[in-house]
Amino acid sequence: RIHAPMNRPDYFDEVCAFLGASYFRAIAKNHTYGLSARGLAIKTAEPGGEEFPAFVAYWLERPTQEAGSVVVHALLDSRSAAAAFRFVVRPGEATIFDVEMTLYPRVEIAQVGIAPLTSMYLFAANDRAGVDDFRPAVHDSEGLSLWTGRGEQIWRPLSNPAELQVSAFADTDPRGFGLMQRQRDFGGYKDLEARYDRRPSLWIEPLGKWGKGAVHLVEIPTDREIHDNIVAFWRPEAPLAAGVEHTLSYRMHWCWEAPWKSDLAPVTDTRVGRSLTDRSRLFVVEVVGDK
């Protein structure tokens, strides 16, 4: 666990924690803990079962007294691969991780997940069918945001499906993706204990060209908010060859909102219901902005 004077100059808040296996999580100023990240995902949502790599050793560079960042090194190991990670952690209004990963597959890996994110989505205001809960919404993240290599901006609302659901968004050299918590009004959740309105968003910014591949979104059915049921990651189109060094770098933004500003007005709500005039379905999409 790493502590720093983030909210007050006289108190060292917990900034991030490495949680076991390859899981870790972080917060920025005034956040409460929410979604997590992992070092590497292998065979996620595959019929044969998932492989869970683990960080087996850590090294910490001692920061100077005036330092605004700290460097963590980690060794990851699993049956299929080993990897070395370097994290530069900078806490603040948004907490930034600069990540360098050097991966050595022991076998060819086709079902790999780079920069995997793990979150929870139970329900929201627009999908409360069958929900018996006083709260309007319960989720750590409400949507997958994508900024493609072609500049397209995509927002995919999350769901709690009846069966396992996997979606893939093909891309070349993505500019970024993340699991975002956009609703920041306490009234959107009305939960004084969980404070979902203060959960961080997590945006992944590739550093360098990632080539062809796809952002995968895995949605797992759940009936309780204690279970993480959302996974998102980047999967290269070509399998990772065994015995070859693979290097990737990316920046993680644990933030209140996406670190890039869209020039498009965002969709804030989508409502669906029966038409009052015939048997058709009526879709009402609310957009806020002037573009």
Which residue stretches match the model-derived regions?
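Surface beta-strand/loop "capping" patches
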Residues: 260-290
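Extended, loop-rich substrate-binding clefts of extracytoplasmic carbohydrate-active enzymes
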Residues: 34-92, 208-228
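A contiguous, surface-exposed recognition patch within enzymatic or periplasmic domains that forms
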Residues: 7-33, 114, 119-248, 253-263
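Short, solvent-exposed beta-strand/turn "edge" segments of beta-rich domains on protein surfaces
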Residues: 88-94, 237-242, 273-276
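Short, well-ordered beta-strand segments enriched in hydrophobic/aromatic residues
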Residues: 74, 97-105, 250, 281-289
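Auxiliary tRNA-acceptor-end handling modules of aminoacyl-tRNA synthetases
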Residues: 1-50, 58-64
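Acidic (Asp/Glu-rich), glycine- and aromatic
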Residues: 86-135
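Short structured motifs
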Residues: 55-58, 83-86, 232-237, 268-272, ...
